[in-house]
């Protein structure tokens, strides 16, 4: 018996050359050709007990795919070169694989059984190739709903949770209207993730499909200002709040209101709007500037890549955690994500452009240095992380480590506040199982659980749709009983 995982090395999506791609906003990666992707799927075929599709939490850690993608099944079909059935199987659990195949951090790969001793199966690359190939072949077509129930559902927010809920409810026959405060549909998929990572044409293509299937979209509607939840509840049979985690965290240090301090989402949104033909405000333009990105996550990396494309003189990224190791640490056993050091697309670009990795670790920002009202630098200290025997970590300041970094533009990418205060502004309180304290009003996605992964947002959208459908069915039963 031939063990393909031993004879076939892991391979991921082909990428454009760094020196080429930093001069435009086109996607940096593309799908695999049939031959290589079949080989990658074959690496999955010797698995005895798959965990990649489990989709659960251990503490706050995601184990496997939260939407329970049938990964071993579509890998088998790809290995047999049956791409159409692989596409069908993929769509059984995932409304938007063209999104997850581009921007999901792939917890499935961290829980891949092969990853215990070898490089895991390139699941994310296979997923993207399946769906991109399906679009190329013309297999992805509008699914027309045969019969309408007569119920009307309003969904506030058009991110992955809202769109997934809309898709599910529409296919169940309910009439769905999605309300979005921005001028484009997609939420953070559209304005929070840069084009080189997720082309906006990919987002529009899916929105066009959903619209062709009967979903109605309204942009420029700010619920809470233009219309209240109470008013919507009077107009619709059910309302879903899928407004996401909206309030970005700020630095909270002296000088953080200076000119030149910008929040990451505002910066990335302005960049995408420029691609759509809008003028770029000078405060969101990194050209010729020394840029510091505070925050070591994916959004921070996207800011690094965007600043490079704008022509930044230099880019430095502050992270509060230590540098990761090259191999899985003992305290992160399988099936947890290995959380190892990797050179993301943005860091490869920074190394290619500036001949240096932009990442610095264990940095605490203490004060913004200003001249007049404008930022010119950041005073910092280096930290040391000590892990106690009980597993809890403590950070200490390294004596004598003070350093001032010059900066013309500081991008703050340290996440979002909890969503509960934003919900209260809309007049509702979130309760368990997607319901709120207002009858017929539901909540899902980051608006319910706080900032999370795209796959959790899709799962929440699918699950809240089940809750709403059951609620509407109960309303119908009560109506029949009363009559």
Question: What are these model-predicted stretches?
Answer:
Residues 405-407, 411-413, 417-464, 479:
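C-terminal structured "cap/appendage" subdomains that terminate the fold
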Residues 201-250, 272-281, 308-431:
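A Rossmann-like FAD-binding core segment of flavoenzymes
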Residues 160-165, 176, 293, 299-303, ...:
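Extended, hydrophobic alpha-helical segments in both membrane/secreted and soluble proteins
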Residues 300-305, 310, 447-475:
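A conserved FAD-binding loop/helix module that cradles the flavin
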Residues 130-146, 205-225, 248-310, 426-443, ...:
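Glycine-rich dinucleotide-binding loop and its adjacent helix/turn
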Residues 95, 159-160, 184, 297-301, ...:
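Residue-level detector of alpha-helix initiation sites
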